[in-house]
Amino acid sequence: MYKDIKVDPAQLEAALDARLKIRAGFDKPTAGMAAGMTQVNMISVPRDWAYDFLLYAHRNPQSCPVLDVLEEGIYATKLAADSDIRTDFPRYRIWKDGEMVDEVTDAREIYNAHPDLVTFLIGCSFSFETALQEAGIEVRHIHDDTNVPMYLSNIKCEPAGRISGNMVVSMRPIPSHQISEAVKITARMPSVHGAPVHIGHPESLGIKDVNKPDFGDASRIEAGEIPVFWACGVTPQAAVMNSKIPFAISHAPGYMFITDIPDRAWIG
């Protein structure tokens, strides 16, 4: 649960402006947008699968930290005023029987055709990146204006009912002398994935080539930097693929919803 803290009106305006820009057709990764405001992942599944997914998220809180649940027919979240989850992500992925069949920038027609969908909004590691930057730790994909690299790991999630799959991890290259600070900062924010799940040695996670992510873009890793891996909110999409859920809608990896909640509200 987030702390109810005072929000700078300028930050609220920036978050609303970002949502309106996205609603109007902005179609790029959202890292660095409305800096300091929480961003979230999303997965919508049929009502018949919703309990299984809720249990899956409960059993795997580091990769699937649920920040809000929207019942069928509800498209506004308590996390943001004037919001519509059908239009306020830059890009959506449409899934049938575990296969991605389409990507769209406006999902209203699809939600209208599937009125039984229950939506889960999941914490996102973009929400601790401002804190990293304020500590003097460069966030490479923001600096380079690329998408964060994400990988399907060999870490098995705890199954629930019909749902199972492996954890997806995001990666940020961190100078070796700053890793302890990065761990300390992110560990205080478990609702947005918390501390890293792995440091260095990507092959230990089943990653054959760190320069070829499964989602997003590759990041430069400079001399003296170590790849650091965090649990990622794309994990539900891996579960959709593995479990062959009949129908689902998700955000496209890196294309998030921007809320009215400041990042610092999640600091424990």
UniProtKB/Swiss-Prot annotation:
UniProt-listed Enzyme Commission number(s): 4.2.1.-
Residues of the signal peptide? none
The record's similarity note reads:
Belongs to the D-glutamate cyclase family.
Q: Which GO terms describe its molecular function?
A: lyase activity
Matching Pfam families, A to Z? D-Glu_cyclase
The reply to whether Lyase figures as a keyword in the UniProt entry is yes
Q: Supply the InterPro entries for this chain.
A: D-Glu_cyclase (IPR009906), Putative_hydro-lyase (IPR038021), UPF0317 (IPR016938)
Record's keyword annotation contains Lyase:
yes
Protein origin, superkingdom = Bacteria
Q: Which HAMAP family match?
A: Hydro_lyase
**Keyword annotations for this protein?**
Lyase
EC top class named in words:
lyase
Which protein are we looking at?
Putative hydro-lyase A1S_1268
